[in-house]
Swiss-Prot record:
Reactions that this protein is recorded to catalyse: RNA(n) + a ribonucleoside 5'-triphosphate = RNA(n+1) + diphosphate
Stated family: Belongs to the RNA polymerase beta chain family.
UniProt keyword Transmembrane helix present: no
Keywords noted in UniProt: Chloroplast, DNA-directed RNA polymerase, Nucleotidyltransferase, Plastid, Transcription, Transferase
PROSITE patterns: RNA_POL_BETA
UniProt cross-references to NCBIfam families, sorted A to Z: PRK00405.1
Disulfide bonds: none
InterPro entries given in the database record: DNA-dir_RNA_pol_bsu_ext_1_sf, DNA-dir_RNA_pol_su2, DNA-dir_RNAP_su2_dom, DNA-dir_RNAP_su2_hyb_sf, RNA_pol_bsu_bac, RNA_pol_bsu_CS, RNA_pol_Rpb2_2, RNA_pol_Rpb2_2_sf
Organism: Aethionema cordifolium (Lebanon stonecress)
Compartment annotation: Plastid, Chloroplast
Chief place of localization: plastid
Annotated protein name in UniProt: DNA-directed RNA polymerase subunit beta
Annotated GO biological process: DNA-templated transcription
Amino acid sequence: MLGDGKEGTSTIPGFNQIQFEGFYRFIDQGLIEEVSKFPKIEDIDQEIEFQLFVETYQLVEPLIKERDAVYESLTYSSELYVSAGLIWKTSRNMQEQRIFIGNIPLMNSLGTSIVNGIYRIVINQILQSPGIYYQSELDHNGISVYTGTIISDWGGRLELEIDKKARIWARVSRKQKISILVLSSAMGLNLREILENVCYPEIFLSFLTDKEKKQIGSKENAILEFYQQFSCVGGDPIFSESLCKELQKKFFHQRCELGRIGRRNINWRLNLTIPQNNIFLLPRDILAAADHLIGMKFGMGTLDDMNHLQNKRIRSVADLLQDQFGLALARLENVVKGTICGAIKHKLIPTPQNLVTATPLTTTYESFFGLHPLSQVLDRTNPLTQIVHGRKLSYLGPGGLTGRTANFRIRDIHPSHYGRICPIDTSEGINVGLIGSLAIHARIGDWGSLESPFYELFEKSKKARIRMLFLSPSQDEYYMIAAGNSLALNRGIQEEQAVPARYRQEFLTIAWEEVHLRSIFPFQYFSIGASLIPFIEHNDANRALMSSNMQRQAVPLSRSEKCIVGTGLERQVALDSGVPAIAEQEGKILYTDTKKIILSGYGDNTLGIPLIRYQRSNKNTCMHQKPQVRRGKCIKKGQILADGAATVGGELALGKNILVGYMPWEGYNFEDAVLISECLVYGNIYTSFHIRKYEIQTHVTTQGPERITKEIPHLEGRLLRNLDKNGIVMLGSWVETGDILVGKLTPQVAKESSYAPEDRLLRAILGIQVSTSKETCLKLPIGGRGRVIDVRWVQKKGGSSYNPEKIRVYISQKREIKVGDKVAGRHGNKGIISKILPRQDMPYLQDGRPVDMVFNPLGVPSRMNVGQIFECSLGLAGSLLDRHYRIAPFDERYEQEASRKLVFSELYEASKQTANPWVFEPEYPGKSRIFDGRTGDPFEQPVIIGKPYILKLIHQVDDKIHGRSSGHYALVTQQPLRGRSKQGGQRVGEMEVWALEGFGVAHILQEMLTYKSDHIRARQEVLGTTIIGGTIPKPEDAPESFRLLVRELRSLALDLNHFLVSEKNFQINRKEV
């Protein structure tokens, strides 16, 4: 959050700021911290010493540009150089050298990294903060059992529990527990020191048995007892140095390393003053924790809420990158040790650069970005998706929770989330509540806590001085925080009015003079996705959640349009997404076309700005920039030069404002189906472009290299018509399903017996050598028809021209809206296109205009998303008045029914200015009498007509529709595979069989269960009779699924004999059965 110079005012932070700050913290602090931990490495004879110097490091500017890295599938990274020294102890000479230790992927202006040509983003993770937490549970007798859980930095746990006899046990796993006296003694304290450092020594003495006195008599005995319990070892182990090392490694390092944050939390919770650099659990911590546990048992102290954000920490980009850098340096340490030993063995003179290789660092980061669950491919469906993806918070991932084990309490909204984590925006399905989104103004503090800004109101003069504070979740517990802002109060009687406030996780109504802090912005509690929903306060939260997710699935349209009713954040989202081209300096436009814009700079310098042209996103949507400035125009810094996909004039534009009616129409909008006019198809209103990538690789086989060629034997010329002389499809070609995109032959060895008779005859008589190559061309799959817009030939480094590594073909498709496509509004109102009506058959208004889309009115009351009605009516008023509205949420705090008053007043004004009384009829405001396009008769009831903002989603029928005539079968069940990608079949399940039985279609049912499914012999006979002709024989034995059941029962030692009853042998002897 940035103050803008005036006290008490602020601007919205950059939406990518969280990512930028994290990466900067890693480069500025994390790198130095990890290099400083790198140990001095000596050889076996301790004659040579190698070390890294932390004072200076250098990151070199990348050798390639971002765009080239994407185009050539390379990593956009910087070379890291550090100073290293090699010291010969005998002569005390030191050789210092700046060495290259590897490449670090850089973050670009979108907050993402480019690895192997793919945009990847690192998600922030929420973990339980290391420290100690006191909780209470009821045992089987209904008695409260108090426990204190110490969580280490790596997620290991050590539990302290107090039983009904006031004995304290330390539980190192679910089964083993030992006395706290034994644990303290194993950590180095004797009985006298233990009793001196606790508040209740008499309680500790009360449960000291003779056996425990013997165990804590010496440190060795205590360590042996602890080792026996911890490792579940039987017999009598003998004390040794290796036993101590094993215990140190397995227990004290894994479960007792608190880290910086853990040490701070334990000091605060237990009122200790141990230095922050002491990051391991000490005996003093254990004893202080035991004292607090005894206090809990006797009613002193407060229990901890594990789901409160003060007990969580954010593992940010900086932490994840720093962990990987530390891992790479640990691998580098092993490499250096091995290299020093090898150099001395072969009597070579080492230098610092010779000892170090760049492989550990480079491979560590490549595997992290490629395999780590928190490193994800950037979703680039539209500009909003890019922004929102980087602001996600996940409970999942290493050290976190899983969707199966997380309980409802963890997933639920907590009062401490307000202003930090959006209570609306989360994923649907198994991960609901586990993947959240940052609130707009939230930021990550130095200690990994989420901070939210508030205005502080001073006691003496609350009007004159206002200061902005950032508070962590533990700090705002002690303040009365007003939920609204001061505009909601009448200036004259401000002090007398009551305001809603939050205090200690409760929501109260208090007098204005008691308020300490107030929120700074109406959208402060919401994420970006939720903040783009107008009239969100009139919607049910579940529908707002769906809307937040569906806006991210909107497809950029060929002709974008700004929303009439918005919230005001559309411009900020578009600018921060990096989709529009923005002027970096002021100047004059010298030249502009679809490829580039040339701008005059300072002096005689010119600045060329390349534009993105028909670039594919990873969701196959089209990224394209259109220039918005003309030649000769003078521009200022920050001005929009070109709009990108789904932006207009620098504002987010995901959908279209279209004329909608809420009414039933012949059942075609039953159950959320949507009826549309053919105008939306022929007018290209919802037309979008999609770009698909098809890729083929060439390999060098044991028989020789694969060849790219146009000369493909045994293929029709029609399929090869689009190939050039090299065997690659030509740019601009129109290709259909089955066409060859790249011709490729793979060499193979053919035995004499494998040749066809005519091939052997040609070889014997004419001496013609028959081709031994197999055709392995790249063919266009089903549904891939379109125009070839780009072909990329990516060769290996140093490779020859006939052996390229990859060939990529990009094909553009133009898709109009059609039956089966999914559309949605911004209030969770979604539906599938059920029918496209001719324009003349659509219902029409009193001025003759036909509506574009018909929604079902029954979808509104039960879903409780009334915001769509407000938006619909206000959109109609805006289109008639040529106005755009930007409305903040919760406007009812200014006065009652504020939203309704605004909408009705705008409709009334539109009715007056356009002289159309039907726009606002006082008897049924917002509704209008409309006419049936087929008959011209008016409908019985007035209907709500308006112009909401409707999006076309990426769930399109072209990607979903699928049919199977033949395909693969599963090996075990012999049934067709599942899924479109595997050319699978449709499963006839239990309920489908009931439906077929209900209509008595016995033959169809038999075919579904035998020929078309898993009867091996019957389906082969079907193929034979189809070719030869004749009737298809009925199957006489059981299908494979029944045989499988029998085999599974036999594996359980249950033998099942079966026989088939048919019409012929129906009168069978029962004794035979």
